[in-house]
Regions:
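Intrinsically disordered, low-complexity acidic/polar segments
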Residues: 44-46, 109, 137-139
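Conserved SAM/AdoMet-binding glycine-rich loop
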Residues: 1-99, 104-106
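Short N-terminal helix/helix-N-cap motif within the alpha/beta-hydrolase-1
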Residues: 6, 111-112
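C-terminal accessory regions of radical SAM enzymes
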Residues: 112-182
């Protein structure tokens, strides 16, 4: 939206102009490029998605984070479960595979929000390996939860930072309702 939706259109047009869109050859091989990207659930239109597919886009990673209304409201994503679901189906309809990034362990995560996520995954027919909410240095969460992080790491912030390489592993827990075991 910041580019008034012109950049992606221009990129797709250039891929066609330079003859880089995927085409199957007679021998069964392909020429051109398949590509992917990331997007926000609110920043697409069905028209631009179809244009992207026609230019070779095979999948889009969406930072949906959660399908829980109360979690989405508190993390300030600017999206809702409804916009997440709408973008999921619009992307599928355009012939692009939507890949949802999901996060568990938000500060206000609870059993209700976890159940809402599981229900959405089942309803949408998607398999998800969620990431854990992580207070990266420089983020608001790091500032807010620094004392808690230091306690969890026995005062050794360097060990916490070294643990940050894999977002599918639990580092410092920032959930108000669950501990690392739960």
């Amino acid at each position: 939206q910041y580019s008034k939706r012109t950049w992606m259109k221009g990129i797709c047009e250039l891929l066609h102009e330079k003859d880089l869109v995927p085409k199957e050859k007679k021998d069964g091989t392909w020429s051109g490029i398949h590509w992917s990207g990331t997007s926000h659930a609110t920043l697409h239109t069905p028209e631009i998605l179809k244009m992207m597919r026609g230019a070779g886009c095979s999948h889009l990673v969406y930072g949906y984070e959660s399908f829980s209304p109360h979690v989405m409201k508190t993390i300030g994503k600017g999206a809702t479960p409804k916009t997440n679901i709408r973008s999921f189906f619009n992307t599928l309809e355009a012939g692009i595979r939507p890949i949802p990034n999901q996060i568990m362990g938000f500060p206000n995560e609870d059993f209700v929000s976890i159940r809402q996520n599981i229900n959405a995954w089942n309803d949408l027919g998607i398999m998800v390996k969620p990431f854990f909410a992580t207070p990266y240095p420089g983020s608001e969460w790091f500032s807010v939860y620094r004392n808690s992080i230091e306690k969890q790491y026995g005062g050794d912030l360097e060990s916490f930072i070294l643990d940050l390489g894999d977002a599918t592993s639990i580092t410092a827990v920032i959930s108000h309702n669950f501990n690392a075991v739960e």
